[in-house]
Amino acid sequence: MPRLRVYELAKKLNMSTKDLLQELEELGLNVKNHMSYIDEETVGLLLEIFEEEEETAAKAKAAKPKKEKEELEEIFQEVVLKPEDLQLNTLAVKIGVPLNRIIQDMFVKGIVLKPTQQIDEKTAKDIAKIYGYRAKFYQPEEEISELETIENELERLEKYFETLYETHKDELSIRPPVVTVMGHVDHGKTTLLDKIRRTRVAEKEVGGITQSIGAYQVVHKGKKITFIDTPGHELFTEMRAKGAQATDIVVLVVAADDGVMPQTIEAYNHAKVANVPVIVAINKIDKPNANIEATKRQLVDKLNIIPEDWGGDTITVPISARTGHGIDELLEMILLVAELREIKCYPKGPARCVIIESKLDRSLGPVANVIVKDGELRVGDYLVAGPTYCKVRILIDDKGKSIKIAEPSQPVMIVGFEEVPDIRYSIYAVESLESARTVTQQLKERLERDKMAKRRVRLEELLKMMEESEKKELNLVLKADTFGSLSAVQNAIASLKSEEIKINIVHSGVGTVNNSDVMLASASNGIIVGFRVKVDAQARKTAENEGIQIKTYEIIYDLLDNMKLALEGMLKPETVEELVGRGEIRKIFDIKKVGKIAGVQLLEGHVSKDCIVKVYRNGTFLFSDQIDSLKHYKEDVDKVSAPQECGLKLKSNEDLRENDELEFYEQHQVQKKL
């Protein structure tokens, strides 16, 4: 029997690597981690020991009757009570418990209550709790902020699901890992996924960057792995962060010929904040200038990542996404880390999903690309996503096929939303359309009212500031194809800072540029910027009539470059002085009714009547002045060049002396840059 690594022995014993590590520790064997080697003799002994234990356990299991499943802990339901419910008979109806039963149960506890008796809030809460309810007291609408209401409702849903999973923890099962591929632009993330999926993706990307997060599922040795591809460009920070929050494992791609770059550091920080394990894929090892050891040294120096083969605990796998070298080992390591992490879900309950991307599809309407985290998502399910609800009409898998059921960790596109869901919210399945509407309708109305009120106030403030301030402003209406793209464009524009110009984003949204966008741009004297969106015919016509500029882009770099040029065009030109000549005063002529005239010998360059003159005495700067008159002999001239002499009179009549040194400067207007 050859020597084996711990995880290889675990496979032979048909047990998890985590359990084997624990068993080896109890046996007193010194093994550091799953990659540690076990010698031949020890492997043989361990196989004998564990085979005997397995036989003993099998006999014991056959002799022992199967235990009854423990009764599940009751989930407390929430009930909202109004002031008029603080009467015993009304409370009984509210919680659905017979009045006589409540009176009897409370009497046993030593509390005497009458049917029409008024009770206080504490008593109402205590009674409700006895029968499995959590009482919450109604507040008038005006006292509850829109955001607080949304958070309360979503928090209630989240807590319900958490309670559900905690209650059914014995029924949780292992689900496929969700893996996010991160790294610097052009380090080979999309090419790696392309090689894994055996389809061409890299060639389809616009402008050299992945502009929307895509999720794909593959099978390796009979086990599923879900991959999320996140953009590498620095502008897509929030999209990368979203990917990290939705994932179980991060594969950090670092090019062996380029090393750790700014977005490598940023991507790793996202993974660290999300407390997600990282596997480093050192890519492009087929390149002539690839240096694996130097790349590992950078991982240590810049990220404090110590590779396993250097004594650390981070798995590093040298790969070539182009040739496919090392990819099988990378997939093996992903499955190993997933096994050690014991990634679980509750597959039988209602579905819970995380939104990777959402957009308005021209043919399907509002859609969301999601990863199912728990439960089974089915066609016909009713879903809640913040203030938006959905009856699932269609589920489309990562291969573009329509399916009926999506299982945990499966990436799917959901079709059927009333409007584009915000990627900040999770998706929860509820029991009925009525429940979905109840949770979302009021929230949606409040959001819309609040949005319109804020828009009006904000617009009035902007117009007032434009009138009162000399500082130039650029008002923008932004539209993008997805929420992720919109966020990236907002971040890009925010990076174009200037002390002279303030950028106001009057409105931003997802979808086609419409007539409302044009009217808002007109009211704020702004322009419309669209990213990967179309402009409807009516909006284009209105824009022409109103004189509103609409600029649309497909590539983020083009948008940035044009925005930069637009801002630079609004900047005041900068005055730059250019040294054009030098001279020395040889004689001072004091002429009545004229003043002092300096006789100057030009030493180099020239002097013109428009020059600024700087005066130095014994090497020390005295003052600068403008030329009042310039003469060559007795003629008024516009310009005199070295080595000629000239007579000049300054406008200020400052004290000039013989041997004073003069410098002549011409002023130019130069366009400022951001």
UniProtKB/Swiss-Prot annotation:
Residue ranges constituting the tr-type G domain according to the UniProt record: 174-344
Report residue spans for region: G1. 183-190
User: What is this protein called in UniProt?
Assistant: Translation initiation factor IF-2
Enumerate the subcellular locations listed in this protein's record, separating them with semicolons: Cytoplasm
Which Gene Ontology MF annotations are present? Answer: GTP binding; GTPase activity; translation initiation factor activity
Read off the SUPFAM superfamilies from this record: Initiation factor IF2/eIF5b, domain 3, P-loop containing nucleoside triphosphate hydrolases, Translation proteins
PANTHER family listed in its UniProt record: TR-TYPE G DOMAIN-CONTAINING PROTEIN, TRANSLATION INITIATION FACTOR IF-2-RELATED
Q: Kindly list the GO CC terms recorded for this protein.
A: cytosol
Q: Where is this region: G4?
A: 283-286
Q: Which family does it belong to?
A: Belongs to the TRAFAC class translation factor GTPase superfamily. Classic translation factor GTPase family. IF-2 subfamily.
Q: Which NCBIfam families match?
A: IF-2 (TIGR00487), small_GTP (TIGR00231)
UniProt-annotated stretches for the region G2? 208-212
Which HAMAP family does this chain map to? IF_2_B
Q: Which domain of life is it from?
A: Bacteria
Which residues does GTP bind?
183-190, 229-233, 283-286
Q: Which UniProt keywords apply?
A: Cytoplasm, GTP-binding, Initiation factor, Nucleotide-binding, Protein biosynthesis
PROSITE patterns named in the record? G_TR_2
Q: Coiled coil where?
A: none
Q: Report the function annotation for this chain.
A: One of the essential components for the initiation of protein synthesis. Protects formylmethionyl-tRNA from spontaneous hydrolysis and promotes its binding to the 30S ribosomal subunits. Also involved in the hydrolysis of GTP during the formation of the 70S ribosomal complex.
Gene3D superfamilies attached to this UniProt entry: 1.10.10.2480, P-loop containing nucleotide triphosphate hydrolases, Translation factors, Translation initiation factor IF- 2, domain 3
Q: Where is this region: G5?
A: 320-322
Spans annotated as G3: 229-232
